[in-house]
């Protein structure tokens, strides 16, 4: 077998798309103290107990959008590694310019 990727008779294949895995329990990894710390950084003094589930959903939606755009930039550049610049450009595209990471 010759060097390179793929086995016998694989030939050239287009870019692989990553499957979108959805793990329901992973969103619970954002703990109440973590949400509380984020709120404190934003200047919140008291937090209602109903906020935690809503903030998890908002954070999940925000991160899905940013990651989707960053992966799109990565795939367009024919790379397999998402760089910090991909994330910076994804945030800039959504109107949330992030300074300090180049670009």
From Swiss-Prot:
GO cellular component terms attached to this protein's record: nucleosome; nucleus
Subcellular location: Nucleus; Chromosome
Region (Disordered) location: 1-29
Gene3D superfamilies for the chain: Histone, subunit A (1.10.20.10)
Biased composition (Gly residues): 1-12
A Pfam family that the UniProt record links to this protein: CENP-T_C
Biased composition range(s): Basic residues: 14-23
Role: Core component of nucleosome. Nucleosomes wrap and compact DNA into chromatin, limiting DNA accessibility to the cellular machineries which require DNA as a template. Histones thereby play a central role in transcription regulation, DNA repair, DNA replication and chromosomal stability. DNA accessibility is regulated via a complex set of post-translational modifications of histones, also called histone code, and nucleosome remodeling.
Name of this protein: Histone H4
UniProt source species: Tetrahymena thermophila (strain SB210)
GN (gene name): HHF1
